[in-house]
Amino acid sequence: MAGLRPRGYRSPAWDFSDNTIDLLLEFGFVYDSSCMGNDVHPYYLRQGDQASPTEPYVFGRPVDLVEVPVTWGLDDFPPFEYIWGQNSGLTSPSDIEEIWRGDFDYAWRHADGGVYALTMHPQVIGRGHRMLMLERLLDHIAGHDGVAFETIGAYVDRWKAANPLERWKAEHPEYAEPGPRGAA
């Protein structure tokens, strides 16, 4: 519609299949924002991870697809939407503002170069009392030196330029080395 190919992907409900990474790579995607492997620092996704209830977790190999991590704690849906039998959806916006503000303040103090990625749905955050909370939060964030509001794509371009895959793998073996993790 805009004449541009999509560069990034966020999975509905943050679900991945065994084919998701293959498809994103095949269609030239640069980043994903559906996984929770870190709180605020991006990383390269791995292809071929294997999980078993009886064996150690096995890491696959890192691929040239940047993950901009998400978290349920920075998603508007769980606290604000009613799902019968699961949650009331009636959390006060001021309670969520306190949580989101606290997460931002911690990241700003302790996670240099990180990204604070809120997940918001227009039908959820777009109600008057919630929009007022969001305005206060954005004003708070904007009041901090060194904060930039930008698209995930622009952030990923800068991050990739500073963290080429091969160098990143060498500097982050805890994410990058294929093979078993943990005890059986």
Predicted segments, located by residue:
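Active-site-adjacent pocket scaffolds in enzyme catalytic domains
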Residues: 4, 10-111, 168, 184
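C-terminal domain-boundary segment and adjacent tail
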Residues: 90-184
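Alpha-helical structural signal in soluble globular domains
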Residues: 1, 23-30, 136-140, 144
